[in-house]
Amino acid sequence: PVGGDLGRPLSQTTKAAGKGSACALCPAFGRCGGCSRLDVSYADQLLAKEQQVAALFEGIAPAGALLPILGMDDPFHYRNKVISPYAPAKGAKRKGKDAKLARADILTGMYETGTHRLIPTDTCAIENETAKKVTLAIRDIMARWSMEPYNEDTGAGFVRHAVVRVGHKSGEVLVTVVTNGEEFPASKAFCRELVRRVPEVTTIVQNVNTRQTNVILGDKERVLFGPGFILDTLCGLTFRISSQSFYQVNATQTCLLYTSPSPR
């Protein structure tokens, strides 16, 4: 996948991505902690990874034992699981109990590398586009209905995260809304509105996490809409995927890994 951390040897690196880095593929690159190699062509990333593995096995493996690396035809928007935190924008304050939130009052995106400073992003080069659409729709619904984002510093606020999983083959979409409390006002209306905005959504689950922690999911859950899981097919096998399930985030390369013939 493009943009990953594995592979470019330091000898081939001009400098690590910094706060001032720019990249045509992503306006947040260099600040967002999601990618660190998005400014390097995919072909060069693959070459660097191949060279790194070759260096590790030099003097150990016989000559010609290293097979060419198998990359993706399209290394973008491959992540079928997207985790988006929500946080109040700096300085955002509601004037009175009944005052409305604005979209700009709610941040969602990725954390800056090594911090818990949220970098807002409306686009992402590696996340599934339907999943990204869901996370932004939730932000807009929160603003419209004055649903407070969670504040890590104070422990106040209601919506902490959205975890979205999209079936690679099935296209089914599971949305897990992580809340800071069990009571979910107008949950049925929320589900109707989210499905109206993103019709691909097939099920919505509320996960409750009231602990002041960086751990995303809590122990309590309830299904708000649909069956509470999605089905997807991987390498000819059907999997039932819930909010807590492990499932490879790059289904394309997973199938390639398991179906490629092994040398004897």
Question: Which residues make up each language-model segment?
Answer:
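SAM-dependent transferase fold signal centered on methyltransferase-like domains
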Residues: 1-222
